[in-house]
Design a protein with these regions (language model features):
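Basic, Lys/Arg- and aromatic-enriched nucleic-acid-binding interface segment
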Residues: 31-90, 202, 292-343, 481-483
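Non-catalytic DNA-binding core/recognition domains of DNA-processing enzymes
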Residues: 1-7, 12-20, 70-99, 176-179, ...
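Short, charged phosphate-coordinating catalytic segments
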Residues: 78-113, 216-221, 329-359, 495-502
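Short, basic (Lys/Arg/His-rich) helix/loop patches that form interaction surfaces
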Residues: 64-68, 170-222, 226-231, 313-323, ...
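Catalytic-site neighborhood detector that most strongly recognizes the C-terminal catalytic loop/helix
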Residues: 223-257, 272-289, 504-549
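Conserved tyrosine-mediated DNA breakage-rejoining catalytic core shared by Y-recombinases
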Residues: 1-19, 23, 31, 52-63, ...
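Active-site/catalytic core of tyrosine-dependent DNA strand-transfer enzymes
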Residues: 131-194, 204, 283-303, 380-475
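Long, charge-rich alpha-helical interaction segments
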Residues: 253-308, 403
């Protein structure tokens, strides 16, 4: 008995009873579900990334095979290059076309009359563009996007091409099995030690972007129609012109080239990407992004109408009310443009959510009962000053209306004392309180408008429809236009993708900036990001304005 070992020998056959055991079957089902969930989260699950030395060895191998006269060798070389440079699988590569006319566009390579090559792909839109977008003040977008093709690929792409619309690979002598076998043979003989696979080739660009943070992956999405997991949401908000998109691609491949050269200084690198302007305007992405001119017109309209409603020295009751409405709309629009706040009822439900000392704002605009997506975002100095002015405005407003609307005056006093009241509450009580006021249409928040009902002014929380109705007649912007503008401008100014996602609340599974194990310093990021957003706001014309009531 002393020699008895309870440890089961792994080589033993599983008891037949285990095969039909319901408990074990449930565990297996859970395991499968977990695998499916991981499979949907491509970037975090598949982390194998080609190193500089592996890429250098592969480039030498491809350059050597390209010199051979065998058609299969040249086809394999072209497939490998396209998988690496387009981020597409073998099946997607062999379905591409080559054409020299712009009629009936499709995915593939376009050869223009000058003999230059362009990679052409349709753009995937969450909401389709409309013909009247420009008249609404929105940035017009295109259905197809053209990206310069590296010149070193053109000789291989032109082999056997005589004009018209043709498949890129007519014979398809290289099947996916042959490609995998050749890559395996190369890897077995490689002195770098890493294994080159078709999966590593086709996913290199997106994994490199995610690992290095050199550019926002949405650039790849729009350029090559990749529809990546990590760009599913952000694709709806980013709007990129050709200069921004091509500059990002150039930075990406310059960074890759430096890593390859650091690993192998003697390797001869081709020009992975070359800047070349497409003859026509190419803006792709969000169909709800206001143009720079539109943003200036909106701000100018808000400012001029605020000036028009300044009360006279007598400060009549009606003039004070109307001025308050204009001041709230100006502040609300600035809040949306500066923070990326979603269009919701009762944004900024409490002034205590503005952490002035740290330059942060707590937002829970698209959340669940557990505040899974609650976030802290940067408050640029210009907005921080405006929120301080707004507090002073509410103090003066309460004094002006205390005789006529005593209940509302007391409510405003309560809103202004929320900081000290919060400190007296237990976290559980504070959470319950916040669930009641968040996006509330009945409990009054700091941003409210007076509406005329039966000859009486009634305060109602500001809503998305109020922002839309207040726009000049020449504009028809969505209520969350500021969110689209903010995302696009941050990418344009080459802000770290991680910071952009943090500000916008675009997180993937496993990312938790507010978790205990997070290494992200919100205060440091906010200090740096605030300077950038401040410049963006001032370029449009936004100012922090003290109230005429103070």
């Amino acid at each position: 008995d002393g020699d008895y070992d309870k440890t089961r020998d792994k080589r033993e056959t599983t008891a037949p009873a285990h095969v039909v055991d319901s408990r074990i079957q449930r565990l297996k089902a859970i395991d499968v579900t977990a695998k499916v969930r991981r499979g949907q989260n491509v970037v975090l699950q598949n982390t194998e990334l080609l190193k500089g030395a592996e890429l250098a060895g592969l480039i030498r191998y491809l350059q050597k095979r390209e010199q051979l006269t065998d058609q299969a060798d040249r086809e394999m070389v072209l497939i490998c290059w396209l998988m690496l440079l387009l981020g597409k699988t073998y099946e997607e590569i062999v379905d591409l076309s080559v054409f020299d006319e712009l009629d009936g566009l499709t995915s593939g390579l376009y050869l223009d009359q000058k003999g230059e090559g362009w990679r052409c792909f349709p753009v995937s839109y969450s909401a389709k563009p409309h013909l009247d977008d420009t008249s609404k003040g929105l940035t017009p977008t295109q259905a197809f996007v053209f990206t310069p093709c590296p010149k070193f690929l053109l000789p291989m792409l032109r082999v056997g091409y005589a004009g018209g619309l043709k498949p890129l690979f007519l014979n398809k002598t290289i099947t996916v099995e042959i490609l995998q076998q050749r890559l395996k043979t190369y890897s077995d003989k490689s002195i770098e030690g890493g294994r080159i696979t078709s999966d590593k080739l086709s996913n290199f660009m997106q994994r490199y972007c995610f690992a290095s943070g050199c550019i926002d992956p949405v650039v790849l999405d729009f350029s090559y129609r990749l529809v990546l997991t990590q760009t599913r949401v952000s694709r709806s908000y980013a709007c990129l012109n050709d200069d921004v998109r091509q500059d990002a691609l150039l930075r990406l491949w310059n960074a890759v080239g430096l890593e390859i050269k650091a690993a192998d200084p003697d390797v001869t690198l081709p020009a992975f990407f070359e800047l070349r302007a497409w003859p026509h305007n190419q803006t792709v992405g969000s169909t709800f992004t206001p143009s720079l001119d539109t943003c200036k017109r909106l701000q100018s309209s808000l400012l001029s109408r605020l000036e028009e409603h300044k009360p006279a020295r007598t400060y009549s009751y009606d003039s004070v009310i109307r001025y308050h409405n204009r001041y709230v709309l100006y502040t609300a629009y600035l809040l949306m443009f500066a923070t990326g706040y979603r269009a919701v009822h009762n944004p900024l439900p409490s002034l205590s959510l503005h952490l002035k000392t740290y330059g942060l704002l707590a937002i829970s605009d698209k959340d669940d009962a557990d505040f899974t997506h609650a976030r802290l975002v940067c408050v640029p100095p210009l907005l921080s000053q405006q929120l301080s002015y707004y507090e002073e405005h509410l103090t003066s407003l309460a004094d002006f209306i205390r005789y006529r609307l005593p209940d509302l005056a007391r409510t405003i006093d309560h809103l202004l004392r929320q900081d000290e009241l919060m400190l007296m509450q237990h976290p559980t009580e504070a959470a319950a309180w916040y669930k009641k006021i968040k996006n509330s249409r009945t409990i009054l928040g700091p941003l409210f408008l007076f509406h005329k009902q039966n000859d009486h002014w009634v305060p109602i929380n500001i809503a998305p429809k109020d922002l839309i109705k207040d726009q000049p007649e020449s504009l028809q912007l969505p209520a969350n236009a500021g969110r689209h503008w903010l995302k696009s401008e941050l990418i344009k100014r080459k802000v770290e993708p991680e910071w952009v996602d943090w500000q916008m609340g675009h997180w993937m599974t496993g990312q938790a900036p507010l978790a205990y194990y997070s290494a992200l310093s919100h205060v440091e990021v906010s200090a740096l990001l605030g300077v950038v957003i401040d410049e963006m706001l001032k370029e449009v014309g936004w100012k922090s304005l003290p109230s005429a009531l103070t």
